[in-house]
């Protein structure tokens, strides 16, 4: 990493500050919509809230934001960047060589982050639309919760529907809108506190600890389940590191934290002033003058949409990284925007839409959704803490210090997990079931890949160079293709899958001028695009290792075109002049890609568990993108060949020949 790149990454700018507001803080910035409301409703309503309860609640929120968001994520996790990229899978790639079992927290953390992301749009948009209940002239319409649900679903349909076209055209307004949003949170919160400046006593952590053990707190430690709603966006903050740079987050987070803390304090001050008024509206909207509420609802809806968009885009990125790390099935990925960071995965988009819509229909109110929200993200944070401990050790932190620091955060997050566990019975089970389903799919995919590596046999290409040369020169066989390309997941030195050589020499000898053996390796660096070539001392056999970052598309033909030109220009590969062509001077022949698919056969030596893994993986493959589409081969000539998983060590089934018995009287 050059000093100039490091400086640019750590450097802050005015434009970067605004961009960070629009990309990074959508989730955590919309938490004031529902956090205080959740606390009040679980306490029994505004009239049941005492001053000590309010002071303790605000103190818990302030210190939760300080410990988890500021110290763990902003000050520690942001330093764990993988070539400027953040997030749990980027962190995993930094430490995966330290222990093979680290794949487990990475998969669990990724799955729970995905499942939590499916709930966020439902909670934020519903909370914003429910604000219309406090708007004079519209309240009589939106007192009917069905109208809230219909409006929310319309917004979600539009939001998920435009994903296929890319969101760059509206992304430019995200930053300015969120700047207005945070400014409003800060200003309105500050003015609400002017009549109750005692609310700032909540900065003292005494009030937080006192509330946890106070009889006035009807929920005891389980109140932390509502408190945690204030910091659910901390993980997203780390995941979006690569989009805005560390420096811009360092500069923007103090502003964001100040604004949301003022909002929480302002809502608390309004509750103290109106606890006997009988008003049972969301304190966030009720604390604003009635003539401004319609504008606030509009602004809150925009902020909720921006937060939802960030979660949707983050889900696409998360799944894309998991696919390239070979722990998730391959789904079709498109790039509707001008840059690689704007990607779209249709299957994931519509699964998220289905889950989000079902959440709105099943839970109906934001209060019911809040009762289920946050459980999964506590697990994600615990998994991130585990990986961070290994990262600190890798970077030279004394092991005892790394253990102590991360043990502290693990303890805090485990307490939040226990406090949120009660949400399981109030709808949290839906998020847990979704997370378990994602973990199951990841486990099957990862385990299936390991089984294939275990059983597939390899042969040395050098031992077959002469046979392949003879086949190339044998005019008794028709030319199969000028260039035949085999894609192999397993290629080390000159060792290659036996099934590939079987395809060339045995299955139907494939005569070609050049045989290409291509292996795609995903690197820990996100945007690597490099290759290494070995001609094996010939001009007809080419081994290509493609080294692509885990955020790069694996469109092999595009890379191969460049490699062919490089080899011909350097004289390592003869030009393939074409007699018949519409392109004058064309000196590259035609290509055919051969894909070999391994399938489980009933006569193979797999254990029952391994057979279950492979059969389940095969079933999942039916709904995933084909390798042809994944490697960008849909416009190329492709042959798909099916081979049994184990090409050797075939079990010999006992069978005897029936010998005719001669008639003794003959």
UniProtKB/Swiss-Prot annotation:
The chain crosses the membrane at residues 16-36, 58-78, 100-120, 141-161, 165-185, 221-241, 253-273, 294-314, 343-363, 373-393, 399-419, 424-444. GO terms for molecular function: potassium ion transmembrane transporter activity; symporter activity. InterPro entries: K+_transporter, K_trans_C, K_trans_N, Kup. It is a multi-pass membrane protein. It is found in: Cell membrane. Keywords: Cell membrane, Ion transport, Membrane, Potassium, Potassium transport, Symport, Transmembrane, Transmembrane helix, Transport. This is Probable potassium transport system protein Kup. It comes from Streptococcus pyogenes serotype M1.
